[in-house]
C-alpha cells in the first residue's frame, strides 16, 4: 500500500480521490478554504502566501519598507557619483570666440552690397524742407526776401511736366471713382426704396 498523505490544514490522512493538491500539499476538499473568510476555494481561485491559503480578495499585499540603517541603503548613499571623465575642462568647438557683430562676414557683405535705386523717387520731395513761413508783407505790400525765395522755389517745383501730368491723371481717376461710387450709392437707395414700397 502507498504511504498515506496528510492534509495540509487538519493533518489527517487525505486520500487521493478525496483531496486537492496545491502548493506541494494535499488538502481535503472541505479543508481547502481561505484562512481569512473561510470561503471554499478551488485550484483556479486559491492564492498561497507564507504557507497559508487565501482567496483573491484577501491575499495579503507584499510591500517593501525602507529601513534607514539597512546595508543596501547605506551602500547606495555612499556609492561614488557618476562623473563623465574630462567634462569639467572640456571645450566645445574652437578656442576662439565666434565673430558675431559688425565684424562678421555676413554683416560686412550686407553693408557693402550695392544699394537699390527706386525709379521715380529722385525728384520727389514732400513739403518744402524748411521751417514753415508766414506771409508777412512789408509796409510797401511786397513780400520779403525769404518769402520771394519760397515763392520761386514753389513755382519751380510745379514746372516739372511729368509730375504735373501724373497728378492730373490721378486727379481724373479719383473723380471717376467718386462718380462711380455716387452712382452705385444712388442705385442702392433706389433699390432700397423699391423694396420698402413692396413691403
From Swiss-Prot:
<keyword id="KW-0206">Cytoskeleton</keyword>
<dbReference type="InterPro" id="IPR001781">
    <property type="entry name" value="Znf_LIM"/>
</dbReference>
<dbReference type="GO" id="GO:0030027">
    <property type="term" value="C:lamellipodium"/>
</dbReference>
<keyword id="KW-0440">LIM domain</keyword>
<dbReference type="GO" id="GO:0005886">
    <property type="term" value="C:plasma membrane"/>
</dbReference>
<feature type="compositionally biased region" description="Low complexity">
    <location>
        <begin position="163"/>
        <end position="174"/>
    </location>
</feature>
<dbReference type="GO" id="GO:0043327">
    <property type="term" value="P:chemotaxis to cAMP"/>
</dbReference>
<feature type="region of interest" description="Disordered">
    <location>
        <begin position="134"/>
        <end position="199"/>
    </location>
</feature>
<dbReference type="GO" id="GO:0030864">
    <property type="term" value="C:cortical actin cytoskeleton"/>
</dbReference>
<keyword id="KW-0963">Cytoplasm</keyword>
<dbReference type="GO" id="GO:0031012">
    <property type="term" value="C:extracellular matrix"/>
</dbReference>
<dbReference type="Pfam" id="PF00412">
    <property type="entry name" value="LIM"/>
</dbReference>
<dbReference type="GO" id="GO:0031143">
    <property type="term" value="C:pseudopodium"/>
</dbReference>
<comment type="function">
    <text>Associates with the actin cytoskeleton and may regulate actin polymerization in lamellipodia, through a rac1-dependent signaling pathway. May play a role in cell motility. Involved in cytokinesis by regulating the microtubule system and linking it to the cortical actin network.</text>
</comment>
<feature type="compositionally biased region" description="Acidic residues">
    <location>
        <begin position="175"/>
        <end position="199"/>
    </location>
</feature>
<comment type="subunit">
    <text>May interact with rac1A.</text>
</comment>
<protein>
    <recommendedName>
        <fullName>LIM domain-containing protein E</fullName>
    </recommendedName>
</protein>
<keyword id="KW-0479">Metal-binding</keyword>
<keyword id="KW-0131">Cell cycle</keyword>
<feature type="compositionally biased region" description="Low complexity">
    <location>
        <begin position="146"/>
        <end position="155"/>
    </location>
</feature>
<keyword id="KW-0862">Zinc</keyword>
<dbReference type="GO" id="GO:0046872">
    <property type="term" value="F:metal ion binding"/>
</dbReference>
<dbReference type="GO" id="GO:0051017">
    <property type="term" value="P:actin filament bundle assembly"/>
</dbReference>
<dbReference type="GO" id="GO:0051015">
    <property type="term" value="F:actin filament binding"/>
</dbReference>
<feature type="domain" description="LIM zinc-binding">
    <location>
        <begin position="5"/>
        <end position="65"/>
    </location>
</feature>
<keyword id="KW-0966">Cell projection</keyword>
<dbReference type="GO" id="GO:0030175">
    <property type="term" value="C:filopodium"/>
</dbReference>
<keyword id="KW-0539">Nucleus</keyword>
<dbReference type="GO" id="GO:0015629">
    <property type="term" value="C:actin cytoskeleton"/>
</dbReference>
<dbReference type="GO" id="GO:0005634">
    <property type="term" value="C:nucleus"/>
</dbReference>
Amino acid at each position: 500500500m502507498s504511504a498515506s498523505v496528510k492534509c495540509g490544514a487538519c493533518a489527517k490522512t487525505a486520500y487521493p480521490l478525496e483531496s486537492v493538491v496545491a502548493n506541494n500539499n494535499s488538502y481535503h476538499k472541505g479543508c481547502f478554504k481561505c484562512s481569512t473568510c473561510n470561503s471554499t476555494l478551488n485550484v483556479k481561485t486559491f492564492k498561497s502566501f507564507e504557507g497559508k491559503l487565501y482567496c483573491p480578495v484577501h491575499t495579503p499585499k507584499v510591500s517593501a519598507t525602507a529601513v534607514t540603517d539597512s546595508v543596501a541603503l547605506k551602500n547606495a548613499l555612499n556609492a561614488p557619483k557618476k562623473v563623465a571623465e574630462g567634462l569639467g575642462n572640456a571645450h566645445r568647438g574652437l578656442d576662439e570666440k565666434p565673430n558675431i557683430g559688425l565684424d562678421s562676414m555676413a554683416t560686412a557683405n550686407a553693408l557693402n552690397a550695392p544699394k537699390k535705386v527706386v525709379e521715380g523717387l529722385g525728384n520727389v520731395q514732400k513739403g518744402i524742407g524748411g521751417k514753415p513761413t508766414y506771409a508777412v508783407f512789408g509796409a510797401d505790400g511786397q513780400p520779403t526776401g525769404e518769402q520771394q525765395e519760397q515763392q520761386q522755389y514753389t513755382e519751380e517745383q510745379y514746372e516739372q511736366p511729368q509730375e504735373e501730368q501724373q497728378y492730373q491723371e490721378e486727379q481724373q481717376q479719383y473723380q471717376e471713382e467718386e462718380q462711380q461710387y455716387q452712382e452705385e450709392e444712388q442705385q442702392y437707395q433706389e433699390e432700397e426704396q423699391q423694396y420698402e414700397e413692396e413691403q
